[in-house]
Amino acid sequence: CGFDPGVTGVYTAYAAKHHFDEIQYLDIVDCNAGDHHKAFATNFNPEINIREITQRGKYYEDGEWKDTDPLSVHKPLNYPNVGPRESYLMYHEELESLTKNFPTIKRARFWMTFGQEYLTHLRVIQNIGMSRIDPVMYNGQEIVPIQFLKAVLPNPGDLGENYTGETSIGCRIRGIKDGKEQTYYVYNNCSHEAAYKETGAQGVSYTTGVPAMIGAKLFMQGVWKKPGVWNVEEFNPDPFMKELNEQGLPW
């Protein structure tokens, strides 16, 4: 239970409970408008981050999953307190459970922002084979290129000190309420500087760790607890949403 996936599922459940009789269109939007002042760095595990971005895109529409070439679908989206940022359609795993648990959804997509300098570095990494996940022989031993790359890139945990700007992550939802079409946008903006001042970590780590703590707290209190395996959107969203406002991630 991080932010996405995690909070975005709770956001969707909250919208379904309080603002819609039927959710039809869901766009999860993730913008990091921060600057870590490094030539190239990832905000979490580089191996996972690069593999996530370079895989084929995937979204849900009219009852079926549709694939796209990596980062081939993009458009500018406007983010609160940030402005327009080019946003790229990607596959993100929460779409799988959200379309199952809210079967009225006609289309569900996930968007993430990237700067051109980041994408240029990413293309170079791919073109020279450093994003490969298969072992290669080097000096008589096997190494995995992307794991070697991880070892030489900046540690995501060390980015916080000089990080400026903020993240903006949320759900843009369209559907029906009382027979009328309605839209609803629920989001959080998190300052990298404020996150570092409070915890010594940058905003991406903060927005991942705080929701995990809230989920664990609700589980230990028995608020979110029932037999079986459940996704976050299958629990009552209200206690979680209340905790977000109290624990540093207001919406």
How should each PLM-predicted stretch be described?
Residues 17-251:
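C-terminal catalytic/substrate-binding lobe primarily of soluble NAD(P)-dependent oxidoreductases
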Residues 6-19:
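Active-site-proximal alpha-helical scaffold in enzymes
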Residues 3-5, 33:
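Conserved A3 ("GATE") glycine/threonine-rich loop of ANL adenylate-forming enzymes
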